[in-house]
Every structure is written in C-alpha cells, then in structure tokens.
C-alpha cells in the first residue's frame, strides 16, 4: 500500500529517522545504548540540597467505583521511579479503596463532583505532569469533568500522558489534544485502531505499523504517540523509534499503568533537562523510550521470578532494580 505523497516527501527530506532497537540483533545494541544514554542524561541527580517535590509532583486523573487498581498502579509507579509526590484525582467511591492501598498517595475524591474541574484546577499549579485515564471508565459525567481538567491543564502548559479511557475520550474528541505537543498518547493495539479510525477516517495499514504511528502523530499535530505491543513504536510525527527491550510473554492487566505513571515522571524530567541533554532529540520521545524500556525490563525481571503467575504488583516491585540496571550502570 502506498504511503501517500505527504509521507513520501517527509522521507525524501530526511526528516524521518527510523531506528529499530533489539537486544537480539548485535548491530542494534549500540543504538539501544545510545538512546538509553539520552534517558540517563535527563535523570536529575539525587541531592541533599533539594526540597520535597523538586524531583516531581505528578497527578493521576482516574479511578471510579469499578476500577481502583489502575490509578494506584500509575501513581505508585511514579513514586517508585523517583517522583517526590503523587496525587490521584478520582471518583468519591474509589477514594477509600485507593487510600487503603497505600498511605504514600495523596487522594482527592472529587472527579464525580459538580465542582471537579474547579477542585482539580486548584492543584494544577503545583503539578509537573498529569497522567489521564487509568481506571477512568466511560461515565459521561466523569468524561465531561476530565475534558475540563485537560483543557485547564493545556492552558497552564502542563504535560499530559493519556492512556486507557482517556484515549476513548480523545477518540471521541480529537480536537481536545490537537496540536498540543506536551501530550503523549499510549494506546495498545485496539486503542490505536480506534484512534486512527477516528482521526484519519479510515483503517490503519496493518502491514505498515511504523507509517501508521507516524501518520497518526502528524494528523494530531505532532503529538507524541506510543503504540504498545510486541514492540513499542514511538513517533512525534518527525521521528520514529522502536523499542524492543526484552520483556516476557506474560501480559498481565495493569502493566500499561506502570508505563503511564513512569512516563509522567520522565516527561517532567526530560522537559526540565531540555533538548541539550537529549542531543537535539525530542525530549518527549526520549522520555517515552525510557518508560517503555523500564516497563519491559520490569516485566522481564518479574517473569524470571514468578513465571506465568506474574502480576503488575510483581513488576512494580522490580522498578528500583530495573531502573538501576538500565539507567544507573
């Protein structure tokens, strides 16, 4: 299938760089290491002179009566990666459950209230990034409130990572994040297909995953897109990266929440570090590559210990060791 004149022109101008990273291919190890070094460059050093909150205050928007695990996984992953504070803005019915999971999270039971947008807005000046969608569900009232929170976040230039039912909302209203280059979308295969059809008004080419991710990003105004799968394909509409860091064959529910939570922290660090630390590469792409690599490494390590019984909680327990192995050695 032809990629179309626009894609061809972009390739001809040399603005599209495709790199495939695989630990199984010797020639790719150097590229893999080079990109991981860019991730290392954005990680702020620990210092006794810093104050609480300086290394990241992350907000997770999601959590309803049915889904309480996802926002917990995202928020606790942000802390495990290195954020100092992690907030959860959830429906009132979800709040006691999420609080019971961990005393380390700051939980706001406001998402289903009429004043949800106002209540969340009061906290936005204190937050460095938002993760929108884990455990959100598709209740119309919740989605309307999340739409308002997203608009308020954009107005304040706050980076947003959108996953799960946050992507459902974007598929219904693509204009919500059109052209907002501090947004990162993290769809799985089905979520990506839905988004692609909604934005480009047609099915994606299953034989051209790289081109499909590139085109969706371009159509959204160069919003960064991470298509999760056997290999994670990342694009900001100009560059395409493929992460094949070794994981495992175990696909447990919740590991996407680990990815989105860790990505929220890494996006903040990357934007704070700036392009000079990423050698001119997109800071958001570097952050996304780091989050994908970390999630896969956690999956690999957990699977080595637990095999078929591996769960996301097992993966989160591996964050510290996986982070050290990838980024501190």
Curated annotation (Swiss-Prot):
Cofactors named for this entry: Mg(2+)
Gene expressing this chain: NAXD
Role description: Catalyzes the dehydration of the S-form of NAD(P)HX at the expense of ATP, which is converted to ADP. Together with NAD(P)HX epimerase, which catalyzes the epimerization of the S- and R-forms, the enzyme allows the repair of both epimers of NAD(P)HX, a damaged form of NAD(P)H that is a result of enzymatic or heat-dependent hydration.
EC class (word): lyase
Residues binding ATP, per UniProt: 228-232, 247-256
Glycosylated position list: 207, 222, 279
The reaction(s) this protein catalyses: (6S)-NADHX + ATP = ADP + phosphate + NADH + H(+); (6S)-NADPHX + ATP = ADP + phosphate + NADPH + H(+)
Residues found modified as Phosphotyrosine: 67
Enzyme Commission designation: 4.2.1.93
Intracellular or extracellular location(s): Mitochondrion
HAMAP family: NADHX_dehydratase (MF_01965)
Protein name, entry field: ATP-dependent (S)-NAD(P)H-hydrate dehydratase
Domain YjeF C-terminal stretches: 35-326
Pfam families linked to this entry: Carb_kinase
Gene Ontology MF term list: ATP binding; ATP-dependent NAD(P)H-hydrate dehydratase activity
Other facts: This protein may be expected to contain an N-terminal transit peptide but none has been predicted.
GO cellular component: mitochondrion
Keywords annotated in UniProt: ATP-binding, Glycoprotein, Lyase, Mitochondrion, NAD, NADP, Nucleotide-binding, Phosphoprotein
């Amino acid at each position: 299938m032809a990629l179309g004149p626009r894609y061809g022109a972009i390739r001809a101008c040399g603005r599209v760089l495709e790199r495939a990273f695989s630990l199984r291919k010797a020639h790719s190890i150097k590229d893999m290491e080079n990109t991981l070094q860019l991730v290392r460059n954005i990680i702020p050093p620990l210092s006794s002179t810093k104050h609480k909150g300086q290394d990241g205050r992350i907000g997770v928007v999601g959590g309803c009566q049915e889904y309480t695990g996802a926002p917990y996984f995202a928020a606790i992953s942000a802390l495990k990666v290195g954020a100092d504070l992690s907030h959860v803005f959830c429906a009132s019915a979800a709040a006691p459950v999420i609080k019971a999971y961990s005393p380390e999270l700051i939980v706001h039971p406001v998402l289903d209230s009429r004043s949800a947008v106002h209540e969340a807005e009061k906290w936005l000046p204190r937050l460095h990034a938002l993760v929108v969608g884990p455990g959100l569900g598709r209740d119309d009232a919740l989605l309307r409130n999340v739409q308002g929170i997203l608009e308020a976040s954009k107005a304040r230039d706050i980076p947003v990572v959108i996953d799960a039912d946050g992507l459902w909302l974007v598929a219904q209203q693509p204009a919500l994040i059109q052209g907002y280059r501090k947004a990162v979308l993290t769809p799985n295969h089905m979520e990506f297909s839905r988004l692609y059809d909604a934005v480009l008004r047609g099915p994606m080419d299953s034989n051209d995953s790289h081109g499909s991710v590139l085109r969706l990003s371009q159509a959204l105004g160069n919003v960064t897109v991470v298509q999760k799968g056997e290999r994670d394909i990342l694009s900001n509409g100009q560059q395409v990266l493929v992460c094949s860091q070794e994981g495992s064959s175990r696909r447990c529910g919740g590991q996407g929440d680990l990815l989105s939570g860790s990505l929220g922290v890494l996006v903040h660090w990357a934007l704070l570090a700036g392009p000079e630390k990423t050698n001119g590469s997109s800071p958001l792409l570097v952050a996304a590559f780091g989050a994908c690599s970390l999630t896969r490494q956690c999956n690999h390590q957990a699977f080595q210990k637990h095999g078929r019984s591996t769960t996301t909680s097992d993966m989160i327990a591996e964050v510290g060791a996986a982070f050290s192995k990838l980024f501190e050695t």
